[in-house]
């Protein structure tokens, strides 16, 4: 019995992260140092809608400051989103503060995601010559890292100021590189202006505005469409998320802060991909699907593996064959990259509680295959308190609370496997939900046994999986990789149609 359908926890957290790309409002500031002394503190409010329902707001404020005799710009961005997941409320608040030169070069930032009851995560960054010093706090523990840095990398808010200071004209393009805190990486941003179009607003009114397409390399499949007035100010910004449209409108403070109505958007229901019934999907040894990825190259969305073969039919269409790979009776551990065994900020395999759970679950067996089987079953039985209000907790947090949904099952299982010396990673994709006859966003775990990546799903507890999972991306959740939530990017931007062939 599948007990936790349509897991969208970390996906819900990823939506505000996309807000850094789609909602940082157009604030009247100058990118020309000569104009910096004329810049006054300004602010912009936005109301955010998804599938026609208000889901949150954002506020951007910017002010000129003088520091050590230099003119700088200080920007503050705050957003708050409210959703429902199978009837339970989920609230996520995001804060981004940046300090940059008047021509947009990033100097320092503070980034926070708050999602009660889980602990907040914080990231700070300070440019020190040719290095960016990052400090990330997860579950109260700080991890410091460094990245090579170029002085011309822009702030996350620069694209809007660029349009305001020097508005694009139809047919013009502009490119630059900017840092995205949620991804802990630099992305190449491209702006492309089209013609004036009649643009409708939430209040029924419309304006003729310049259509501007924004793309960036961090999430290649995501296209943000902005609509600018003659001053270069973005009055409306939209993009497709989870197969639906998210729109941010520039509004008054009073409009932005209006209470969200009681019938908040239920993402777990609104983002399902309906298919014909698949009897006993999680017991089947093999299944064929035709997958269409609207607006994206299908081979950039789906990931081949030992359990999933992909036959390309067209640029956006593929035939996918999913074949079950059961846990073997016995297995040995083969050499793998260190990242699949290392403790990390989200997979704290060295945490005392995580190690204790792994020991209790494994018992006296030393056979890695049997350990994997027992750990999966243990979490299926013990981690049975639903908490759909948490977006993405670390393994150590889950080990303390023993509550959550598919994300928490996958992360804790991966950490427990590593605590027993078994290489692991998490997988993002879609899973078939029997009761809803639909596929929903999901996360599960893979263990490396005898050199093969064997799928495990602690929300099912069946000793492996059948043919009801569609795989998109796998991640070690290494501290050296992109931000943890970024692994959900392909799932969030995907616009899938799934046809059951067998």
Task: Give the role of each language-model region.
Residues 156-160, 324-326, 331-404, 412, ...:
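Secondary-structure boundary elements
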Residues 26-30:
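Sec/Tat signal peptide C-region and signal peptidase I cleavage site
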Residues 375, 402-430, 445-446:
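Cysteine-centered nucleophilic/redox motifs
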Residues 248-261, 265-267, 333, 381, ...:
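Active-site rim recognition segments
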Residues 12-25:
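Bacterial N-terminal signal peptides
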Residues 1-12:
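N-terminal secretory signal peptides that target proteins for export/translocation
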Residues 218, 240, 388, 420-434:
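Short, well-structured beta-strand/strand-turn elements
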Residues 31-149, 164-329, 481, 490-492, ...:
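Acidic, serine/threonine-rich low-complexity disordered tracts
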């Amino acid at each position: 019995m599948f007990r936790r359908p349509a897991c969208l926890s970390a996906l819900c957290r990823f939506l505000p992260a996309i807000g850094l790309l789609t909602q940082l409002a157009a604030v009247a500031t100058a990118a020309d140092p000569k104009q910096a002394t004329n810049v006054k503190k300004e602010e912009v409010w936005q109301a955010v809608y998804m599938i026609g329902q208000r889901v949150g707001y954002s506020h951007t404020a910017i002010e000129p400051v003088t520091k050590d005799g230099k003119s700088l710009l200080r920007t503050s961005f705050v957003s708050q989103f409210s959703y429902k997941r199978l009837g339970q409320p989920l609230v996520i608040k995001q804060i981004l503060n940046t300090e940059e030169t008047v021509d947009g070069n990033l100097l320092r930032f503070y980034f926070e995601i708050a999602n009660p009851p889980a602990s907040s995560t914080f990231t700070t960054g300070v440019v020190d010559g040719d290095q960016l010093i990052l400090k990330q706090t997860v579950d109260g523990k700080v991890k410091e890292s460094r990245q090579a840095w170029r002085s011309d990398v822009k702030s996350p808010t620069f694209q809007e100021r660029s349009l305001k200071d020097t508005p694009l004209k139809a047919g013009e393009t502009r490119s630059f590189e900017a840092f995205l805190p949620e991804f802990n990486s630099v992305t190449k941003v491209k702006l492309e202006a089209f013609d004036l179009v009649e643009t409708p607003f939430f209040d029924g009114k419309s304006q003729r505005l310049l259509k501007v397409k924004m793309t960036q390399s961090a999430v290649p499949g995501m296209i943000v469409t902005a609509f600018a007035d003659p001053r270069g100010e973005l009055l409306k910004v939209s993009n497709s998320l989870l197969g639906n449209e998210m729109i941010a409108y520039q509004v008054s403070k009073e409009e932005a802060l209006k209470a969200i109505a009681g019938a908040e958007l239920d993402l777990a229901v609104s983002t399902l991909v309906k298919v014909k019934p698949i009897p006993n999907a999680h017991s089947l040894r093999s299944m064929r699907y035709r997958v269409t990825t609207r607006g994206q190259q299908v081979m950039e969305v789906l990931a081949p593996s030992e359990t999933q073969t992909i036959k390309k039919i067209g640029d956006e269409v593929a035939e996918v064959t999913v074949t079950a790979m059961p846990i073997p009776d016995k297995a040995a551990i083969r050499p793998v990259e260190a990242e699949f065994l290392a403790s990390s900020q989200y997979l704290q395999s060295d945490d005392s509680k995580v190690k204790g759970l792994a020991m209790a679950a494994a018992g006296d067996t030393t056979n890695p295959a049997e350990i994997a089987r027992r750990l999966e079953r243990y979490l299926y039985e013990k981690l049975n308190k639903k908490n759909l209000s948490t977006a993405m907790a670390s393994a150590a947090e889950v080990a303390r609370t023993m509550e959550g949904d598919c994300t928490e099952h996958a992360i804790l299982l991966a950490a427990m496997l590593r605590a027993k010396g078994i290489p692991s990673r998490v997988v993002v994709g879609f899973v078939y939900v029997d009761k809803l006859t639909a596929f929903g966003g999901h996360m599960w775990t893979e263990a490396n046994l005898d050199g093969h990546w064997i799928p495990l799903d602690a929300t099912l507890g069946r000793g492996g999986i059948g043919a009801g999972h569609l795989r998109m991306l796998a991640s070690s959740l290494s501290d050296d990789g992109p931000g943890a939530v970024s692994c959900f990017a392909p799932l969030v931007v995907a616009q899938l149609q799934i046809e059951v062939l067998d």
